[in-house]
């Protein structure tokens, strides 16, 4: 019987993974550990592996997988910047991802957290906790229908986000290297700077790559409309975090919502209750009154989790049986 290791198992995923194994006549072993130099030897007797990495995979894992006859790694996220695709290819390892698992879920999250900032929820909550129930200009907002929203990246998630904002009646500008002709209700601009210059809300939906690394830094923030709101439910490396904090502090941004952080791997998805966090930048984000931080959780719905579990396992089995899969990256 074919054997697949399901690394990075959350409690709520275990039953889904085992049920998939029964339906597909595959022996699935679940483990809460991640694939790494320390765990790769567990795969000696396996045919395939799926995992949910957050940090960079060590280079010595690829040749070890090859030596064990394993031909793939099925990543259970859309992002894949934790892998060296060229090195994997050199060792005959197919890397795959799950590019679409519930774009609407992430879009809904992106809009809902933006609305918290639009309607000044953090400020209102602090006032109420202090028993200040007055109405003041500082917590007055304006309707989204009178706003311009910039969507940076109009793939599946960005497109879904744009459609929600369109339902509010917002004016929508966008930038994408490959414009979506079906999104005829928005206006594409020739650059990110052009797309954001008049935007009240900026919503990021781009992958992590060389072109997007620290795309939003001090130089980019200099082109932002004063008082804009920035939402990042894409990848942490898209933002230069210290520059973001400066932009909020100096009033360039009214606020920001951050679901991804470039140094999140050690912290996000882990319980750090009653532990010391050494990352001073992360602490500054968390403690900032006008920055909302969530732990890479925008995708987290029952539909998305089911699709990620099955998407990873389906890709692993496809490579085992045919040598490739539809979501292959290298």
From Swiss-Prot:
Q: Which domain of life is it from?
A: Bacteria
Which residues form each disulfide bond in the chain? Answer: none
* Active site annotation, chain numbering: 235, 264, 296
Q: What class of enzyme is it?
A: oxidoreductase
InterPro entries given in the database record: D-isomer_2_OHA_DH_cat_dom, D-isomer_DH_CS, D-isomer_DH_CS1, D-isomer_DH_NAD-bd, NAD(P)-bd_dom_sf
Query: What EC number(s) are associated with this protein in UniProt?
Result: 1.1.1.28
Q: What residue intervals traverse the membrane?
A: none
A GO molecular function held by the record: NAD binding
Reaction(s) catalysed (UniProt annotation)? (R)-lactate + NAD(+) = pyruvate + NADH + H(+)
Known Pfam families for this protein? 2-Hacid_dh, 2-Hacid_dh_C
Q: So what family is this one in?
A: Belongs to the D-isomer specific 2-hydroxyacid dehydrogenase family.
Q: At which positions is NAD(+) bound?
A: 156-157, 176, 206-207, 233-235, 259
PROSITE patterns listed in its UniProt record: D_2_HYDROXYACID_DH_1, D_2_HYDROXYACID_DH_2, D_2_HYDROXYACID_DH_3
Keywords assigned:
NAD, Oxidoreductase
Which species does the entry assign this protein to? Answer: Staphylococcus aureus (strain MRSA252)
This protein is called what? D-lactate dehydrogenase
